[in-house]
């Protein structure tokens, strides 16, 4: 295990350095804003990502090191995976699994970006580890820890609920019901409920708004577009990588680790099914990847095949870092240049107070880079966390709005007799408006 520990520590060090160098994306800045308004949960997502950012507040003087607590937790998931696999696989296969994770575009480079995916991957793997303990030890502590891991996973991202059908399908199809110590199952249910209570309470207090939003966001569209399914399938083949996918499909795991089959393929099949109802974002099945990579690592040829995987995604990762860190390349894509545009915008608009933005992305980024509160103007874009804040409507008789040219204004401004004048244009397509009222 010493070699694996060294690999884990070196890769952690590299991640922490890169995480500090790369500026926060707009979504990350949004979660960072949440961390300055801590709640039991939030409209868009459960609260874990905000809690992790709050732990990093003291690191903000060190570039973008506010990410470090979340990045560390995401990397700790690899160590949990090592502890799970060391009972079942030899060192070489575990090393192969680590490399598959480290060079994965979402589990590797993607783990530098703080989203709800980081904590949910940790608690998904921790739940797998606890399940392995439950099946082996069958004691109260194991069952209680299993429930706690699932409950905390629910505080990270709602996708953790897919763990339950994966487990039930495994117990049913593999005829493993007799391995369950039923007298301790209530301990799992109780600790699971206790540790996900913040999310349950918040939704109860807010008419289950977050649950409704996620269901509508992921499952409801009026008409089917075949491109949803095609893009989902192609994206997953590319992200997992054809050779890795082939190895995972062909391997026949030994009985003690057959549960990996269900935790690998059921989430992928679930989101394949939802692709017939709505567009599926490429990262949604991320919970399946650790088990897919575990299956692939068991294939006798994967130790040799992994060089193609590492070469392909290693080159892409290197190119992404060059594009992010070398200013001349940032203009290749608007999403790449966005954090840098917002960083410049924060400097250009610093003298305009109170300042509002026209989207949660803009407002959050300006707030993060300026360290001065910048709220999104209420109802100027789709409903989000900012619309729940009293500051979303200006209290005085004067304020400033920075927005993208061409974006509209909310109706209530004219109803409240606000008038405005354009006072500044800022590249690439921003405009600052001054609003006043009698």
Feature-to-residue mapping (PLM):
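Short helix- or helix-capping micro-motifs
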Residues: 8, 94-105, 150, 154
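Membrane-interface alpha helices of multi-pass inner-membrane proteins
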Residues: 37, 109, 142-158, 192-194, ...
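Transmembrane-helix motifs of polytopic, lipid-linked glycan transferases
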Residues: 68-89, 126, 130
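Specific aromatic-rich, kink-prone transmembrane helix
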Residues: 78-80, 119-136, 142-150, 292-295
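Membrane-interface transmembrane helices that cradle and orient dolichyl/undecaprenyl
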Residues: 86-91, 127-142, 250-254, 300
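Short acidic/glycine- and proline-prone juxtamembrane loop motifs at membrane-interface regions
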Residues: 106-120
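Transmembrane-lumen/periplasm boundary regions of multi-pass, lipid-linked membrane glycan transferases
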Residues: 152, 163-254, 272
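Membrane-proximal, lumen/periplasm-facing interface regions of secretory-pathway glyco-
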Residues: 278, 305-351, 360-375, 379-391, ...
């Amino acid at each position: 295990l010493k070699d694996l520990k060294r690999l884990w520590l070196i890769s952690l060090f590299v991640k922490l350095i890169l995480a500090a160098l790369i500026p926060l994306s707009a979504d990350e800045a949004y979660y960072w804003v949440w961390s300055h308004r801590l709640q039991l949960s939030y409209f868009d997502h459960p609260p874990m990502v905000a809690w992790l950012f709050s732990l990093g507040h003291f690191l903000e003087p060190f570039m973008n090191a506010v990410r470090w607590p979340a990045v560390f937790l995401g990397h700790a998931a690899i160590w949990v995976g090592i502890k799970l696999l060391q009972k079942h696989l030899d060192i070489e296969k575990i090393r192969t699994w680590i490399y598959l994770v480290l060079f994965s575009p979402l589990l590797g480079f993607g783990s530098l970006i703080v989203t709800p995916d980081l904590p949910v991957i940790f608690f998904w793997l921790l739940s797998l580890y606890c399940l392995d303990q439950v099946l082996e030890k069958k004691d109260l502590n194991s069952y209680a820890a299993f429930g706690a891991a699932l409950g905390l996973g629910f505080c990270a991202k709602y996708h953790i609920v897919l763990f339950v059908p994966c487990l039930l399908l495994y117990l049913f199809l593999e005829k493993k019901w007799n391995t369950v110590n039923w007298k301790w199952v209530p301990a799992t249910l109780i600790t699971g409920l206790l540790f996900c209570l913040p999310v349950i309470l918040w939704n109860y207090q807010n008419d289950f708004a977050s649950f409704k939003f996620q269901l509508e966001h992921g499952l409801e569209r009026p008409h089917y577009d075949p491109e949803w399914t095609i893009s989902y399938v192609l994206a997953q083949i590319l992200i997992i990588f054809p050779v890795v996918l082939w190895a995972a499909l062909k391997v026949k795991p030994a009985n003690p680790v057959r549960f990996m089959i269900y935790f690998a393929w059921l989430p992928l099949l679930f989101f394949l099914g939802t692709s017939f109802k709505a567009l599926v974002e490429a990262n949604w099945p991320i919970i399946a990847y650790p088990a897919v990579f575990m299956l692939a690592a068991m294939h006798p040829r994967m130790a040799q095949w992994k060089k193609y995987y590492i070469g392909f995604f290693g080159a892409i990762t290197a190119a992404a870092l060059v594009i992010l860190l070398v200013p001349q390349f940032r203009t290749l894509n608007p999403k790449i240049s966005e954090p840098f545009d917002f960083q410049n915008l924060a400097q250009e608009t610093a003298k305009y107070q109170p300042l509002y933005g026209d989207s949660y992305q803009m407002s959050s980024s300006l707030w993060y880079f300026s360290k001065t509160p910048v709220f999104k103007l209420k109802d100027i874009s789709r409903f989000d966390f900012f619309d729940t804040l009293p500051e979303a409507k200006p209290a005085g008789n004067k304020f400033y709005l920075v927005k993208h040219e061409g974006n509209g204004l909310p109706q209530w401004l004219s109803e409240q007799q606000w008038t405005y004048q354009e006072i500044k244009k800022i590249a690439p397509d921003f405009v600052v408006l001054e609003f006043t009222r009698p």
